[in-house]
Amino acid sequence: MKCILALKALYEKRESAMKLGLFFHKFKKRILSMTQDRQPEITSECMQLLRLISEHYVGVFSSMEYVFLFQFVYAAYRPMATAAGELICKRLLAPPPQEGVFGQNPPDEFDRNIQNMKTLIDFYLQGEFHRHVPYLVDGLWDAAPALVRNWECMTALLLEPRGGRQALTSQQERVLIEILVAAVRQAAEGHPPAGRELGKRASREVDGTRRWRERASMSRHFVKVLPQLLSKFAADKEKVTPLLQIPQYCNLDVYDKDGLGSDLDSALLELDCLVQRHSDVAVLEACARAYGAYCCEGGSAHCQAAPACSRLVDMLVDALTPLLDVFLQHEKQGQFLGHHEMGRICSTLRRLVAFYSTHDLSSWNLYEKMDSLLTLRRHQGSMPTEVIHCALQCTYYALLWQIVAATDRLPPQVGEGLGGVRCGYG
């Protein structure tokens, strides 16, 4: 460690760095191998040393050696990941133009960020660490804030028309959405993803005022563009599902403070369309959680969102009731419904189950309807598996919400002891 720190001090000065060329070429392999040391503090200091060395010598590392070093942005130790992120910024991404170098026509900063984001997406796709987007974002969080926190750049790329000058491929869009959602989460929560170690000397305190301002700015941006994003990617469940997480991380009070009621209407309309369009469980559960964020009691979106959610559930229950009546009648007579009718029953039940997992639907008496189904199953002995499964899920959530309601009526001392029943729903 002492040797690395001493070398860092020398390489921070160009005069002394230029005298160490032969030394580095002799010990290059040894220094590179130290990035894999067992002590994380040594690996991060070594990565910072290599970044300094790369700034002084042209062509000092081969392309394969750079690829090897860049992958440490996914390291579990945050200082190491940040150091690798700094190297990525220096060697992979286009730097901001220096004053006077380009005369009167410097490159447009927005276009530069667009190109850097495309480069970052391709870097991720070419790597071997898929499913680690939050780690990549966190590794660049301090090294490239103008890139990974550039909401305008990311959403502009996603909203680029098909065939446009900056249009992405479908695979690039999917990765950018993952990057966007990971960055939104980190901006809202103020801490790295789970599993990333901060380091001994890292400050765990976050400037609350700065984070509040960043979140407010982020929220004002997304309440305007989220309806457009949901509309564009409505047909693609893999892309729209992560986008539906964004409302959970935004400060939705901006709807009231900034007079953005029409944007809220647009977001709720898109949610309604998604629920009616999709029957995939992941999409439906994401829609239910998004509605939950908008319907939060005391929030400025509650007055518009809660009635919209109730109307949607009304529509689903109204559609389900006659279907169930016909289904029960056929089952009692030993007859079978057609494939189309069974599909409608199952898809409607899936939608209601998704909402029941997040919202208290006790007012719609779904328990009684599900009890009728399960009673018939007990007597008749045959019923489609998915219908039984959905009926059991509805019954399960109905009972859980009754427990929640009973807990809320208990004295505080008793209710605190039962607080764990809320975990996983509500």
Give the positions of each predicted feature.
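Hydrophobic residues within the alpha-helices of tandem HEAT/HEAT-like
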Residues: 3-14, 31, 35, 46-57, ...
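Hydrophobic, aliphatic-enriched repeat segments that assemble into extended interaction scaffolds
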Residues: 78-89, 148-189, 367, 371-400, ...
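Alpha-solenoid HEAT/ARM repeat scaffold
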Residues: 1-4, 44, 82, 131-134, ...
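Extended repeat-based solenoid scaffolds, especially LRR ectodomains
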Residues: 97-254, 364
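Helix-loop junctions that connect tandem helical modules in alpha-solenoid scaffolds
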Residues: 30-38, 71-76, 117-125, 158-170, ...
